[in-house]
A protein has these predicted regions:
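N-terminal secretory signal peptides and thylakoid transit peptides that target proteins
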Residues: 1-19
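C-terminal capping/gating helix-and-loop segments adjacent to ligand/active sites or protein-protein/ligand interfaces
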Residues: 54-55, 59, 83-84, 151, ...
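Pocket-flanking alpha-helical
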Residues: 65, 88-125, 137-158, 168-169, ...
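Extracytoplasmic/periplasmic substrate-binding proteins
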Residues: 66-68, 115-116, 202, 284-400, ...
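Extracytoplasmic "Venus flytrap"/periplasmic binding protein-like
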Residues: 70-145, 173-185, 314, 321-322, ...
Length: 529
């Protein structure tokens, strides 16, 4: 039987697709401050109705059928409808449109992509309820402490099924041909290795400017320089979400890899720090991060850095020597090195003779160095797999949707789902499974056996400098960073303009966050009350 290897003590907390003002909290609490707990449906109760699933994944017909049929063996009068597609980067806007409708048609979605929506079920209300499909508390079916994805009112809005770890894949053959004998442990060494690769005629890095450089690594390296912001943003005694048993024993230790798992994040304290200038971006630290980024990018990236999203295919074809990516590619790259089916070639849009096998491995994030650095680099260790949120509707429909979610996120439902996934050619799990009691194939266990846990830099505030409150702000802030990387402004000018942007857009941030000025002024006040 499978039990999550990422333990509760070493749980992963992540911002996911939301900004710092959209998802708040920490893992470890047994219940959130949201609506009162409701009774689960009795095991013998027969349900009827329709559940519409519209998560961000695009499962195959076989996977959908396996889960639907397994559920309908227990609940034959329930119709399971799937509104899933390969929406990719369009999913957040698509979901926003669905949630804005007067009569919302979908029931189960990936709510972290619209984290400020106030109509999700507080899943913490069901954490201690007996799951009729496992005959144990739902808490025991799933690692609830992987992340704590909360809305501004403290309601848990999403549960994920897998963990993920981000690092750097590299082509050992190209490293050997260039005479590189040691992996880069520092940012200076990263630049040196890239210089040698470039001199050998190889483009060093395939990286995109959508979710990799301006998101993952913006978070990782902001965290290195700003770990002390924890002392400002963590809940203090008297705050509405302060947990004396948990927060009362917190001791700030920048060398603790899992520090972001050890405190409760209070978004009001973060927003207050931004508004009052206690937390600032026009600093030598921000300028130094950008200076270091400039030493690598766009200089050692592909020419299409700012527009590409397909860096994996470049790495597969040995057009680049290094690829930043997630644990999902441990299986995918292994499979692609072994065999590329006609269907896989068509998916990648490449010819069969475009790929030759090579030796590859991974290395962790090279450390930036200097007097302004406050900690060692962490990774992005967040959630992946399926993201499950439930739309709150009338009581009968809500109970039906939650019942299906409890089935899916337990061995009863996830086993046939996983079996159907592994039956598909080329399936590659994204990371360690977090559903208990599921029999996973030996090859899946082997994929993640050596996966390191470095701590998660995707804490709630680390991505704010390059994302703001999301939407157009993210586009604006990515463009501003590109101006600095392209030498149109200096790193110091960038830091100054960054601070001005955040100040000028405060009102928009407040609106998008779902907070009021009264909330920001008073961390003892629970948002939404």
């Amino acid at each position: 039987m499978h039990n999550p290897r990422f333990s509760r003590r070493t749980a992963i907390q992540g911002g996911l697709a939301a900004s710092a003002v959209g998802i708040i909290g920490r893992q470890g609490a047994a219940a959130g401050p949201g609506r009162a707990e409701r009774r689960a449906l009795a095991p013998e109760q027969t349900l009827s109705g329709r559940v519409v699933i519209a998560t961000n994944n695009n499962p195959t017909d076989e996977e959908k059928a396996a889960l639907s049929q397994a559920y309908q063996e227990r609940q034959p009068d329930v119709e399971i409808a799937w509104d899933t597609a390969d929406r990719g980067a369009e999913y957040p806007s698509w979901l926003g449109t669905q949630l804005a409708a007067d009569d919302i048609a979908v029931d189960i979605v990936a709510g972290n992509y619209q984290a400020t929506y106030r109509g999700y079920v507080n899943l913490d209300a069901y954490r201690g309820v007996t799951n009729p499909y496992s005959e144990q508390m739902w808490d025991a079916d799933l690692n609830w402490d992987l992340i704590r994805a909360l809305d501004p009112s403290g309601n848990r809005i999403m549960l994920p099924t897998r963990a993920v770890h981000i690092n750097w894949f590299y082509n050992q053959d190209l490293f050997d041909q260039a005479g590189i004998t040691a992996l880069p442990a520092t940012w200076t060494e990263f630049v040196e290795v890239s210089t040698v690769l470039a001199d050998s005629g190889v483009t060093p890095v395939g990286i995109n400017f959508v979710w990799q450089l301006p998101q993952w690594f913006a978070e990782v390296y902001f965290d290195q320089y700003h770990i002390d912001w924890v002392e400002t943003v963590r809940a203090q005694e008297g705050d509405w979400n302060y947990d004396p048993a948990f927060d009362g024993v917190f001791e700030f230790n920048p060398d603790e890899p899992l520090i972001h798992n050890l405190y409760t994040y209070n978004v009001q304290r973060f927003m207050n720090g931004i508004q009052t200038g206690t937390l600032r971006f026009d600093t030598p630290a921000v300028a130094e991060i950008v200076t270091n980024f400039k030493a690598m990018f766009p200089r050692f990236a592909t020419e299409d850095l700012y527009v590409t999203t397909d860096t994996y295919t470049k790495f597969l074809q040995q057009q680049v020597a290094i690829l930043p990516d997630g644990s999902w590619n441990l299986g995918q790259l292994t499979a692609d090195m072994a065999e590329l089916s006609p269907e896989r070639l068509a998916e990648l849009e490449i010819e069969a003779d475009a790929v030759q096998t090579f030796t590859w491995s991974t290395f962790e994030n090279p450390a930036m160095e200097g007097d302004l650095v406050r900690s060692a680099p962490r990774s992005v260790e967040s959630a992946s797999g399926e993201y499950i949120s439930v739309i709150e509707k009338d009581q009968a429909q809500t109970d039906l949707s939650v019942d299906f979610a409890m089935f899916w996120l337990s061995a009863a439902g996830y086993q046939p789902w996983l079996d159907a996934q592994w039956a598909q050619p080329g399936f590659s799990p994204a990371g360690p499974l977090q559903v208990n009691g599921v029999e996973v194939p030996p090859e899946e266990d082997a994929l993640f056996a050596d996966l390191a846990e470095m701590g998660n830099a995707e804490a709630a505030y680390n991505g704010f400098w390059t994302a703001g409150a999301g939407g157009q702000h993210t586009t604006d802030l990515h463009n501003l960073l590109a101006e600095a990387l392209n030498d149109n402004i200096t790193p110091e000018e960038y830091a100054s303009q960054l601070q001005a942007y955040h100040e000028d857009n405060w009102d928009s941030y407040l609106k998008l966050s779902g907070l009021t000025q009264e909330d920001v002024d008073d961390p003892a006040r629970q948002p939404g009350t």
